[in-house]
Amino acid sequence: MNDLPRAELPGSGSPNPESLILASGSPRRAQLLSAAGYEFSVQPASDSAECGICSRETAPEMVARLAYRKAADVVARIDDGLVLAADTVASCVGNILGKPHNRDHAEEMLRLLSGRNHDVFTGVCLWSRRDEKFVVDVVRTRLQMSDLTDQQLTEHLDSLRWDGKAGAFGYQDGNDWLKVIGNDSESNVVGLPMERLAELLENFEQNAEKITTPTIDSIESSDSSCS
């Protein structure tokens, strides 16, 4: 990946700026932030913040909703801080591919992706607990996967590098059968679009929306209609 951009946090020039909190236990997202030079703490969202796929949702809608829920979950448990949450899925021929449940599920995903172009979507939510403002955005990266041989598929499954990764692959693993199309964000495939994150931070005060209920309770009713 190219050099990762970094932006100053909102209010960084004030005497008491908010600190950045990563609402994710993903080591890959933490590594991206560290590589870009951000200082942050980690407070993962609870499992209940992820309710899965709603039948009427598109992939972009899903990752936006889950990023919001994850941020809201952490915001409800802190007194101060700028919360960063994200959710990533792959999408291929109308199928939304999250993290595989097991080896068989990973193989099913990889056979679907093999020889096809597909998309990776990451929803990003920044939420200021102090100001009760948030912004949500979604970034898409187009990928091309070569036709996987049985040997390549078996080697990848045996390596366990599919575990915990949307679409059962990790771009950062350097597989020569997986390429980003054009100039789309590589870090987005890893789990956090660093270029867009820098833009969101730079423009947070201008673009963030005010919210009056900093908990996930306000969106539970809409989630209950998922089926």
UniProtKB/Swiss-Prot annotation:
Q: Where in the cell is it found?
A: Cytoplasm
Carries keyword Cytoplasm? yes
Record keywords: Cytoplasm, Hydrolase, Nucleotide metabolism
**Entry EC no(s):** 3.6.1.9
Q: Which cofactor does it need?
A: a divalent metal cation
Task: Give the top-level enzyme category.
Answer: hydrolase
> According to the UniProt record, where is the region Disordered?
1-21
GO cellular component terms given for this protein: cytoplasm
**GO BP field:** nucleotide metabolic process
The record's section on PANTHER family has:
BIFUNCTIONAL DTTP/UTP PYROPHOSPHATASE/METHYLTRANSFERASE PROTEIN-RELATED, BIFUNCTIONAL DTTP_UTP PYROPHOSPHATASE_METHYLTRANSFERASE PROTEIN-RELATED
Output the NCBIfam families linked to this UniProt entry: maf (TIGR00172)
* Stated role: Nucleoside triphosphate pyrophosphatase that hydrolyzes dTTP and UTP. May have a dual role in cell division arrest and in preventing the incorporation of modified nucleotides into cellular nucleic acids.
Name of this chain's protein: dTTP/UTP pyrophosphatase
Organism whose genome encodes this protein? Rhodopirellula baltica (strain DSM 10527 / NCIMB 13988 / SH1)
